[in-house]
């Protein structure tokens, strides 16, 4: 069975191993986007297995390795070691956390030159947990969230953790912004301004690192997910 799954024009996704954080087990997902020059943009990389590497190499050469927020860094080192010529991009806050990694560039509001016109991006700042860079792949109409929007399978939690997951809106019928992220925004005005840019994208799908992708009525889903911020 193939590791990479087609998710639209020039975009593929791959699942990785579950990651344990404070006793909660999160499914993981990465995305591979092929740019117009044939090079690849690797978003939120999962563990690099031999099978995954073979399939990625068959698509094209890796140009960019991207960590979308300061929490998604576990596998950056092995990807950079395997692809030393690729540009390793740091989100806000990650350089201080991972001083052992030699980052080549920093993510900011607005696309980097390497993918301008193909992938747009917005930084949602002012969150005490992490500042997240949200991306939009124009060719497939896909919005890519990392942790701001998520959903974990109910069967991955039990006992008191299941109760916490329900209260945190992590196991609902559709992906949502967990309560902990909602309350961690210290500058909601800045968050709303970033959100308005996201809502202006002609979204067709929403992809996230933890949760079931949304492939229908993406604009409606985004409005529901962030109604707590706009209402």
Descriptions of predicted regions:
Residues 1-45, 103-167, 193-200:
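Catalytic core of the metallo-beta-lactamase
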Residues 2, 8, 46-47, 75-78, ...:
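Cap/insert and terminal regions of metallo-dependent hydrolase folds
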Residues 17-18, 37-39, 44-48, 70-71, ...:
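Short glycine-rich, polar/acidic loop-and-turn segments at beta strand-coil junctions
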Residues 21, 50, 71-75, 95-98, ...:
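Active-site environment of divalent metal-dependent phosphoester hydrolases
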Residues 36-39, 57-63, 204:
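Short, surface-exposed connector motifs at secondary-structure boundaries
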Residues 43-44, 64-70, 89-91, 144-146, ...:
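Active-site neighborhood of phospho(di)ester-bond hydrolases with catalytic His/Asp-centered motifs
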Residues 52-57, 198:
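Short, hydrophobic/aliphatic alpha-helical segments
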Residues 55-114:
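Active-site HxH/HxHxD metal-binding segment of metal-dependent hydrolases
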């Amino acid at each position: 069975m193939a590791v990479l799954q087609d998710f639209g024009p020039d975009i593929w996704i791959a699942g990785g191993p579950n990651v344990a954080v404070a006793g909660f087990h999160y499914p993981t997902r990465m995305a591979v986007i092929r740019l117009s020059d044939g090079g690849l943009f690797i978003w939120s990389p999962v563990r690099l297995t031999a099978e995954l590497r073979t399939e990625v190499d068959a698509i094209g050469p890796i140009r960019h390795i991207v960590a979308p927020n300061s929490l998604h860094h576990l596998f950056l080192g092995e990807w950079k070691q395997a692809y030393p010529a690729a540009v390793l991009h740091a989100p806000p806050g990650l350089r201080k956390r991972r001083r052992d990694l030699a980052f080549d560039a920093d993510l900011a509001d607005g696309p980097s030159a390497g993918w301008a016109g193909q992938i747009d991006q917005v930084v949602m700042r002012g969150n005490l947990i992490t500042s997240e860079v949200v991306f939009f792949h124009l060719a497939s109409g896909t919005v890519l969230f990392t942790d701001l929007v998520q959903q974990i399978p109910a069967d991955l939690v039990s006992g008191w953790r299941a109760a916490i997951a329900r209260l945190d809106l992590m196991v609902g019928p559709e992906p949502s912004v967990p309560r902990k992220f909602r309350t961690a925004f210290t500058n909601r005005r800045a968050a709303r301004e970033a959100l308005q840019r996201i809502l202006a994208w002609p979204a067709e799908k929403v992809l996230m690192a933890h949760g079931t992708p949304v492939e229908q009525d993406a604009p409606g889903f985004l409005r529901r997910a962030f109604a707590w911020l706009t209402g």
